[in-house]
């Protein structure tokens, strides 16, 4: 970058220009348009709390209109469920600095691909499906036969439930066949419709009409005002599952709203409390735990994915115990003695480990949303806490230990847990990596030379990306992935691939690691085009990588403003020749995997 600066502005001293940017007063062009900061009533002490307020501005893509963050997801979709490809901020809701799209925006801006937007969005056309689905009074039996229902329920429990066991299978099946009484009619119908819709989604059939009909039927059941005037465990289960299905259908804000309602309803039911004196059965108590921790991991994960604060209660206000690591046959409605937990993995091991992960790390995700950013020292300190958590995992989840067996549900739970761990590590060091690559001093504690810790931070971030790519490639090479496995594989490997892109583009060709980074990118593209060849989002992601790495001259490059974080306005990007941004899904949206 120094060479480019010297070529374009030979009479300007780079170091002096940077120093000038950091010394500008309150009325300078770089700060005059800043909004007042909201008071922070519960800030975690940081050595960088007042340093370099502009450090996170590179991530703040804002629409031109005051209502530009408004969203309407029953229209043609502008958002993607992974919050990784929606570069244009208008119509997608606010996506903060832990969202994957933050990385993509910053990377594209750093490359100088776009500087202003001259054309507005095309008029959004209401989806025909939105007009056709007036299903509130339609009986479920008119949509699908009893035999098809049974097949969809099997699909749900064989594919989705083994990853997210929030619904007790034996109880649900007994209620479905009316062997035991069903819960409140409307909440049960909403849960049944959502389970059927997820079962259809898991089948990944080319004909999506059945999946669409079942999804909209579940939505219509939730539109009745009586649904928000009552609360029960079945309704919370339905909301949790409906939120996740909405996200998988590229309706992230719709899903987020369902999660918000589910959290409030769960709190009203006391699911976050153990209540040991309550005279309920062991299975009923355990099911309350499973629903609470299922909601906890979904809301935590979605908030981090969308770059929004996690508003769940912390350990200081929760006393509900973790889910038991037991097999289903060990706990039935008639069980009166608490079963002993097994030392081997069960369907509930992944839920238990991931809920522990979020309890211990949610403060990290929230800290990363700070407007002032974090210092390298604080990032390394938080990483140590993250590393300490990983060492507390049971041996069957330790990456250094061989798997105890090779059943697919266990291998996926084990792999996904580490993909999530490495992804948070990538996010943790992202600001440092971007600042280093852009040739700008990132935040550091007072008295510390700005680049002393750069290499350590970069190495941790790049290693996390490399381990993600290797692990995902190995996993997909050994199995025929289910649709839910494919979705998470694309999500995590795309984030990791952008780290490698940044490392390659920031390197001057002298790094001995360059061939390894290039090999990792080739692995990612092979995963997208071969191991996930039937996944539309994988194909789009591979195309994005090709476009990013395609040589393109920088036209009209303003070096001084490029170095000024306050000038990073992503709302002013053009849809230029070839329309790079159209491949991100906001002009030509496609269905999720």
Model-predicted segments: where are they?
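Amphipathic alpha-helical protein-interaction segments enriched in hydrophobic
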Residues: 232-240, 286-289, 351-358, 410-431, ...
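Intrinsic, low-complexity transcriptional activation domains
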Residues: 1-161, 186, 190, 209, ...
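Fungal transcription factor middle regulatory core
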Residues: 65-69, 73, 80, 85-126, ...
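Alpha-helical solenoid repeat scaffolds, predominantly canonical TPR units
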Residues: 214-217, 221, 258, 265, ...
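Eukaryote-biased recognition of C-terminal alpha-helical segments
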Residues: 522-567
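C-terminal transcriptional activation/regulatory domains of eukaryotic transcription factors
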Residues: 107-108, 112-114, 119-234, 241-251, ...
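Classical protein tyrosine phosphatase
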Residues: 249-265
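Intrinsically disordered, low-complexity transcriptional activation domains
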Residues: 68, 74-88, 92, 485, ...
């Amino acid at each position: 970058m120094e060479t480019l600066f010297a070529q374009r502005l030979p009479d300007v001293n780079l170091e002096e220009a940077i120093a000038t940017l950091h010394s500008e007063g309150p009325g300078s062009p770089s700060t005059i348009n800043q909004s007042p900061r909201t008071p922070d009533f519960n800030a975690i002490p940081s050595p960088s709390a007042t340093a370099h307020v502009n450090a996170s501005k590179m991530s703040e893509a804002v629409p031109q209109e005051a209502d530009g963050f408004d969203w309407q997801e029953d229209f043609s979709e502008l958002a993607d469920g992974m919050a990784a490809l929606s570069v244009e901020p208008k119509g997608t809701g606010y996506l903060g600095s832990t969202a994957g799209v933050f990385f993509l925006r910053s990377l594209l801006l750093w490359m100088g691909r776009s500087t202003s937007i001259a054309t507005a969005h095309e008029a959004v056309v209401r989806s025909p499906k939105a007009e056709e689905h007036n299903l509130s009074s339609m009986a479920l039996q008119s949509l699908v036969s009893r035999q098809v229902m049974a097949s969809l329920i099997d699909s749900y429990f064989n594919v989705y439930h083994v990853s997210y066991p929030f619904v007790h299978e034996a109880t649900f099946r007994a209620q479905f066949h009316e062997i035991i009484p069903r819960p409140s009619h409307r909440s049960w119908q909403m849960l049944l419709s959502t389970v059927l819709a997820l079962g259809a989604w898991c089948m990944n059939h080319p004909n999506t009409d059945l999946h669409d009909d079942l999804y909209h039927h579940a939505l219509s059941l939730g539109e009745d005002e009586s649904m928000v005037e009552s609360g029960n465990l079945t309704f919370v289960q339905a909301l949790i599952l409906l939120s996740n299905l909405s996200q998988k259908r590229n309706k992230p804000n719709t899903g987020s709203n369902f999660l918000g309602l589910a959290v409030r309803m769960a709190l009203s039911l006391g699911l976050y409390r153990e209540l040991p004196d309550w005279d309920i059965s062991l299975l009923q108590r355990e099911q309350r735990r499973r629903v609470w921790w299922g909601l906890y991991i979904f809301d935590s994960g979605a908030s981090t994915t969308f770059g929004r604060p996690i508003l769940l209660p912390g350990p200081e206000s929760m006393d509900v115990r973790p889910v038991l690591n037991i097999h289903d046959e060990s706990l039935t409605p008639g069980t009166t003695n608490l079963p002993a937990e097994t030392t081997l993995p069960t369907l509930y091991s992944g839920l238990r480990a991931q809920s522990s992960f979020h309890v211990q790390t949610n403060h990290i995700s929230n800290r990363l949303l700070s407007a002032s950013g974090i210092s390298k020292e604080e990032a390394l300190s938080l990483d140590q806490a993250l590393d300490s958590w990983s060492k507390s995992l049971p041996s069957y989840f330790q990456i250094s230990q061989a798997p105890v067996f090779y059943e697919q549900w266990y291998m996926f739970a084990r792999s996904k847990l580490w993909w999530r761990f490495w992804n948070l590590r990538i996010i943790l060091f992202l600001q440092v990596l971007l600042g280093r690559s852009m040739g700008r001093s990132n935040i550091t504690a007072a008295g510390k030379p700005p680049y002393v810790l750069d290499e350590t931070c970069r190495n941790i971030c790049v290693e996390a990306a490399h381990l993600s790519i290797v692990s995902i490639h190995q996993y997909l090479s050994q199995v025929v992935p289910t649709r839910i496995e494919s979705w998470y594989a694309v999500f995590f490997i795309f984030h990791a691939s952008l780290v490698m892109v940044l490392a390659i583009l920031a390197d001057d060709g002298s790094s001995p690691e360059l061939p390894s980074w290039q090999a990792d990118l080739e692995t990612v593209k092979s995963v997208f085009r071969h191991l996930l060849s039937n996944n539309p989002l994988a194909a789009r992601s591979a195309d994005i990588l090709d476009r990013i790495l395609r040589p393109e001259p920088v036209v009209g490059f303003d070096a001084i403003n490029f170095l000024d974080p306050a000038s990073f306005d992503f709302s002013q990007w053009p849809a230029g020749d070839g329309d790079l941004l159209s491949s991100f899904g906001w002009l030509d949206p496609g269905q999720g995997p």
